[in-house]
Amino acid sequence: MKPALLPWALLLLATALGPGPGPTADAQESCSMRCGALDGPCSCHPTCSGLGTCCLDFRDFCLEILPYSGSMMGGKDFVVRHFKMSSPTDASVICRFKDSIQTLGHVDSSGQVHCVSPLLYESGRIPFTVSLDNGHSFPRAGTWLAVHPNKVSMMEKSELVNETRWQYYGTANTSGNLSLTWHVKSLPTQTITIELWGYEETGMPYSQEWTAKWSYLYPLATHIPNSGSFTFTPKPAPPSYQRWRVGALRIIDSKNYAGQKDVQALWTNDHALAWHLSDDFREDPVAWARTQCQAWEELEDQLPNFLEELPDCPCTLTQARADSGRFFTDYGCDMEQGSVCTYHPGAVHCVRSVQASLRYGSGQQCCYTADGTQLLTADSSGGSTPDRGHDWGAPPFRTPPRVPSMSHWLYDVLSFYYCCLWAPDCPRYMQRRPSNDCRNYRPPRLASAFGDPHFVTFDGTNFTFNGRGEYVLLEAALTDLRVQARAQPGTMSNGTETRGTGLTAVAVQEGNSDVVEVRLANRTGGLEVLLNQEVLSFTEQSWMDLKGMFLSVAAGDRVSIMLASGAGLEVSVQGPFLSVSVLLPEKFLTHTHGLLGTLNNDPTDDFTLHSGRVLPPGTSPQELFLFGANWTVHNASSLLTYDSWFLVHNFLYQPKHDPTFEPLFPSETTLNPSLAQEAAKLCGDDHFCNFDVAATGSLSTGTATRVAHQLHQRRMQSLQPVVSCGWLAPPPNGQKEGNRYLAGSTIYFHCDNGYSLAGAETSTCQADGTWSSPTPKCQPGRSYAVLLGIIFGGLAVVAAVALVYVLLRRRKGNTHVWGAQP
């Protein structure tokens, strides 16, 4: 059932069942093989819990699990909650993921059902079903969250002690023992086996035969005590295993046979397998790596150019952090985590393009220095490098180069080891992974809604609309993007409702993507996130790969939604209401409608009604109230959730815009003198803040509105366009000073010894995006500066000698005079 039809289905369901609990389950009134269904005499949809309309066996068949997430590498044991077997010994549990991947489960002594997650080649929400009759039927269903290996907590995996040492083993001054550690409680068994698994992608690149595969290679240790640590001296692997250059270690219970798939396990991070490479590598690692670098270079030259379809990097660090719809922090170089930028020395922060490129599944990376300057590979080996395989993978995943982490390792990271870390051939790598210099970057456009509520449109118009109901913030037919919001009255300190309202829920969908809703949680006042009307938990993971979007939650009070089109939403709690910011790339120009205005660089038509009629600038607050009411949501197209009888009766059954609600208009605001004085001190000239203090009688609400408004203004400042002149090369046989290429920046040129500068010594980036002077040339011969130095140096020596001579003559004369005195 499409989410847009959910309100109608709920309406029918609520009418049939009333506000009480559902009937007793029988063969027709069961959730067996019906999870998510609304039809029938009782509901198996997630909203049924709040409405009291669930079938009585809802929890038995629509499964909740703990934990709900784990590494896509598999091996995580999880428990089915709210369901126990009465006779555990009779059960034969099989867990089936994505309709085809089966793992053996079990029932513990307390009757709880367990499953083990399988090795997957994708991240995101994975549907699974459970059979208790040895695979004859799978009536129970749930969802498992497969996570990128680097986002898994250290409690859930084994750690390579000094991981750099593992990946440099066999190179100069790196030998001896290697160690790994793990948490014993994470794998409850007496003895363990440690295995090496290798990853490869075979077949013609970008063909149907191109496949990804993890393979069991050989054991490092068998039947050893589960002590939490292991140390060994690596030996070169037999020739038959040498083709695997990247892989991971797996720790399993020794009762399992070698290489047994999909059993409870702890994995290490994937890493370069330097420690298992052949004697040829250990005897001359530089020569060996140089050969591999050249082979990679030859392969790259045969593959299609993926750089052309990548998004352009933001020009500054502030732009990169503000453009949250298209770029997100690279966990390998994060200034919020101490800027440990192993692969990008000189950078303090990197971002990656959120969405992989459509055709090749590639990814952009952009890195910045402490002063916010973009760091380019043309200037530094620490510069940002684009990726043939996006580190986070790309839907539909599973096949190269779209496998999360692993495709990136093969085509972008392992080659970096060959060319840059194990051999001094980094220019070869950088030539094929050049940084984007941001000349064509265009910042997104920003609109916001916050406070009581106040709106700032994409073209900069601001207004206040105090409607009670559900409204269209944004519609864009270009990508079928829809953003809707629910507004409800606030509460005064005496418990009465205010005549102002605020946003309490925001929902978004683009095309046939998932529907995500962010709303105020009734009990905590924090945020609650719903996916297709089901409340999500973020106790284990703060990042989720969803259909058509990515979702990130920060500290429980800010949610970022990144859509496939590059559009982005940020929803946060500010005081008693939600604050929402919407970012749209330039391609949405002339394609938007709704309360956030018509994006076309013309603020005079932002008050456009559904009919196309435009209210002129200077429209009265009363007329603007009618404009807002014109953009009400319809039941048939609502994205919002109605999972309580309060919501059903007040928003599903009632008109989407409450015509009985009397809003507060600016001309009607009055404050007692003492509160007015405090408001003036708090708000200054922020009229949004002043209005909200008057509307709610609360200084804290005014403060929240002022903060939200300031955040909008700061982000607007961060997203201001800047002019880039592009990278400027140093002269051959010379150097340049400066690596900033934005308007107003100056580059200085110098020649090597034995060369003279022909051309300007400096070049400045001009406002039109051109350099004031081209790169000069360094010609053979002494430079003019050196010649002038010699000339002036010689003159200085002559002058100094003359001065000494004069002083000595004077001293000699004085001595003669003094000697004649008594």
From Swiss-Prot:
Membrane topology, Cytoplasmic segments: 807-822
Keyword Ribosomal protein found: no
A GO cellular component entry from the record: plasma membrane
Residues in SMB domain copies: 28-66
CDD domains referenced in this protein's UniProt entry, alphabetically: CCP
Record has Transmembrane helix as a keyword: yes
SS bonds (residue pairs): C31-C35, C31-C44, C35-C62, C42-C44, C42-C55, C48-C54, C55-C62, C725-C765, C751-C778
Domain Sushi, residue spans: 723-780
Extracellular side: 28-785
Glycosylation sites: N162, N177, N522
SMART domains listed in its UniProt record: AMOP (SM00723), CCP (SM00032), VWD (SM00216)
Signal peptide span: 1-27
Compartments in which it is found: Cell membrane
Domain VWFD: 445-639
Regions crossing the membrane: 786-806
Pfam family, one: VWD
Assembly information from the UniProt record: Interacts with LGALS1; leads to an increased amount of LGALS1 on the cell surface. Interacts with GPR15LG; the interaction is direct.
Protein purpose: May be a cytokine receptor for GPR15LG. May be a tumor suppressor; together with GPR15LG has a growth inhibitory effect on colon cancer cells which includes G1 cell cycle arrest. May play a role in breast tumorigenesis.
Protein name: Sushi domain-containing protein 2
Native source organism of the sequence: Homo sapiens
